[in-house]
Amino acid sequence: MNGSQAGAAAQAAWLSSCCNQSASPPEPPEGPRAVQAVVLGVLSLLVLCGVLFLGGGLLLRAQGLTALLTREQRASREPEPGSASGEDGDDDS
């Protein structure tokens, strides 16, 4: 019976060292956690750069459209060079 008790004790010791039998989940090793943090940081930077790139493109497009609209408004206010050659007095009355 001593042999079976020693075998049972050895098996229990092996199970407790091998398998986590407590309620807490096993903690992953630090190496994969560091790699995961680096990958997450790189992906965050890529997303930030993409947002800035797209935002900058939209800003440039908006500025271009604003400049085009301003040019068109100025052109519509100014009389065309060929049409207003002799009718200068009608605007001041």
UniProtKB/Swiss-Prot annotation:
It is found in: Membrane. Keywords: Membrane, Transmembrane, Transmembrane helix. Residues 71-80 have a biased composition (Basic and acidic residues). It is a single-pass membrane protein. One of its GO terms (cellular component) is membrane. The chain crosses the membrane at residues 38-58. It comes from the Eukaryota. PANTHER family: PROTEIN REPRIMO-RELATED (PTHR28649), SMALL INTEGRAL MEMBRANE PROTEIN 41 (PTHR28649:SF1). This is Small integral membrane protein 41.
